[in-house]
Each structure stands twice: as structure tokens, then as C-alpha cells.
Amino acid sequence: MKKQLGFLIIALFFVHTLFADLTINIIQGVNKPYPIAVVPFGNDVKNAWQVPNGVSGIIAQDLTNSGRFANLPVSQMPATPTDVINFNWQQWNNANTGIEYAVVGNITPGTVPNTYTVTFSLLSLLSNQPLIGQQFSNVPRDQLRLLGHQISDVIYQTITGKPGYFRTRLAYVEVFNSTTAKGTWELVVSDYDGFNPHVLLKQSAEPIASPNWSPDGSTLAYVSYINNRQAIFTISLTTGQRHIIANFPGTNSAPAFSPDGQSMAMALSGSDTTDASDIYVMNLKTRQLTRYTDFGSNTSPNWSPDGKTLVFNSDRGGSPQIYSLDLASKSATRLSYTGVNNYDPVFTPDGKNLIIMTQQTAGGPIQLASLNLASNAINIITSGQLDKSPSVAPNGDMIVYANYDSAHGILAETTLDGTVQIKLPATDGTVQSPAWSPFLN
């Protein structure tokens, strides 16, 4: 199968690339990962910055990062074929490696100068036949890493049945010297694995918080300050242009784009004498506001996938708990009953679960948990002392969050059942408020 690879190159204005990348360490994996051999590609192109271990190395790392694949070391491979024709099925089956899948590929010069043609095949040793084969023509050298992620997505979906997330991105805030007059806040966008981080916005003395992706991945909403008052902004990833969305008296916080991108939920305070925050929805075209709560302090709204419901946390019952809000009727229903405090709900893409922050005992750790919407059962996912700001990958397989067990906050990732734990250590400042992008074209 021939396939021309189309690339979207996003130009980030007024940004610079960080010199130190986040690194990933898997500290726990699933019990039965898929055994796979990613055979080194023929004539693989290696570059110390972009693809230090070649395109095949990117694929192997992606699959390992997911925790759902067990990669066979090259030293244990019975051979290193680069295409299906030279793959000796009997030799691999007799090697007793336990491998169920193999990936082979080859790279040749493209027909356009300084480009490459990349072919790969995914083979099943369960059925002794190829599952998929693709060719990508005239790939620029600086896009080989992206191509590796694209191939990983294909392999992931073919084997697991779910879309891969390796071409998605993370937005987060990195904070330096926040307790001093020289404190700076940076709004950063990186690849899903922390590689290729770019600073989209840098500010001194004006904190940045709560980044939230538009559904098309072109824009981030975030919270910062105007004249010492919290306000909600948007910033374009292609132009760097910023817009003020909400700068009402009181505080303006917790922005959340609706699934169709036409509205934004937010928490606003100062609308009455109590100064308690309430949930509002703004029509982004007309800027019309609709208020949905009026009792207790309410914040952290998040949309259901169908856009008909908001979940949020409220202290109306005496302690922070999770509630759902039907937008048509404006009626709210409490969802969480287990634990002392529950915060920051986010939907999984299938709409069946919420990922929340939970504190099960007074003075106990704050960890991530899943809340099943059918049973209201809560299942603890993480084991940190302070785990915050969960955000779910668009395929629903992974969660990114901020972990504060060390002196500096770091990013971490986990599966929904907690069987895969990945830490992405910060290289310098404290990392906080991660947000996982939607699928990107």
C-alpha cells in the first residue's frame, strides 16, 4: 500500500525550544503486554537530536512507553530482516522468543533532495502473515520523528483496536522561582513524550494556570492576570495571538472549551455578595453568559463528550465533592460519596468514567481515582502523596497529571487502571497543570 505522508508544520511565534527534554521511566507495566520485535530498519537515519536511535528506535520507544508492548532486545533477535520477502518465518518461530508480532522496514533516499522514502510492515507470528504494509514518500529529515510516531499509531491501532496517541501533544505550565521577585511562568507545548518542548508564552510576576485545548487543537485557553485580577485568555498555537475571553469583576478561572468549540465553561466569582464562584457557560461568538449554579462555591467544570452535561466540584454539601449538571434542565446531581474530598473531574472519552482527585481520609494523600458513572464506585489509580490536575489522552488509554512528591512538581502518566506508571521528570522548574491535546491532523 502506497501512502503519501502529508505534514502539518506548526509555526510557534515568540517561542524558543527548551534545551532539556523530559524523560520517561516506566515504573510498572501491564501483566500481559503484547510481545513484539521492532527490527532495526535498513539504512535507518539517525540524528542525535531528532532520532538518536533511528525511526525504528522511535517506534520501539513509543510502544514501550504505552506499557502495552514488551519489546524484544535486538541482541535476542534471530535475524534482522528489513522486509517481508527476507523474513524467515520458520527461523523466528523456532527461536522460542515468545514474539507474537514483528515490525520490519527500510529507508531509501526520496525522489526529492534531502528526503527519504520509508517502508514498513507489521507481521503476525500468530498467523504467519503480514497484517499491514505502508510506504511514505519524500519525507523531510526533520519530520522523521513525526513519521515514527505515525507508524506507532498504525501499529497500536492494528493490534489493540484503539487509535494511537503518539502524535498528540501536551500543554503544561513550568514555574521557576515562584516565591521570589524573579519568578517566571511558562506555557509550554511538547510532544506526548515530552520531546520537542516549545515555550508558547513566558511571563514574569504574572502566574499562568489551567491550560485547556480547543477541540481542533489550534488554540489554548488559560488563566493569567490583568491588573492583579485573574482573567481568562486564549492563545493561538500558529500565530501566538492572544485574546481576552473573560475579565469580569472578581475571579475568572477554570476555562473549558465545549466539544464543538462554540462555547466555554468557566468559574466566575464576584457576581453576588458571597464572592463564591459559580459555573457559567459563554457563547464564544456572542460572548453571552449563562449562569448554571447559585449555591456554594463551584469550580473546575468539564464537559461530557456529547456536550450535554458538565461535571464540576462544589462545597455545597460541606466539603468539595463531584457533581453533574444537566445543561438543559440546570439540575445538579451529586456523584461522589466516598472520601473526605473529591476534586477536578474530567470525563474519559467514552463518557463512562470520570477521573478525579480524591482524598479518602482526613490528612491523607491526594491521589487520582476513576469514578464509574454507572455505579458511582471510586477506584484509586495512583499512589503519590499529592497527585493533581488529571487530563485524559484522546483515546482514553492514558492519563497525564502533576505529581508533587518531590521538591519540584513533575509530570506523570498512568493508565486508567493504574497498571502502567510513567514519570516525566522536570528538568528545571516545577511542572504543573498538564492538558492532553485532542487528536491532531
Language-model segments: residues:
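Amphipathic beta-strand/beta-sheet edge segments enriched in Tyr/Trp
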Residues: 22-23, 84-154
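Hydrophobic beta-strand positions that form the internal "hydrophobic ladder"
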Residues: 170, 217-220, 261-264, 307-311, ...
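Short loop/turn segments that connect beta-strands within beta-propeller blades
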Residues: 126, 191-195, 236-240, 283-287, ...
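Residue-level detector of Asp-centered blade-edge/turn motifs that repeat once per structural unit
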Residues: 164-166, 215-216, 259-260, 305-306, ...
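A flexible loop/linker signature enriched in serine peptidases of the S9 family
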Residues: 163, 175-186, 203-205, 223-232, ...
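Blade-level signature of beta-propeller repeat domains, shared across WD40, Kelch, NHL, RCC1
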Residues: 412-441
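Short beta-strand->alpha-helix linker/helix-N-cap micro-motif
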Residues: 27-90, 106
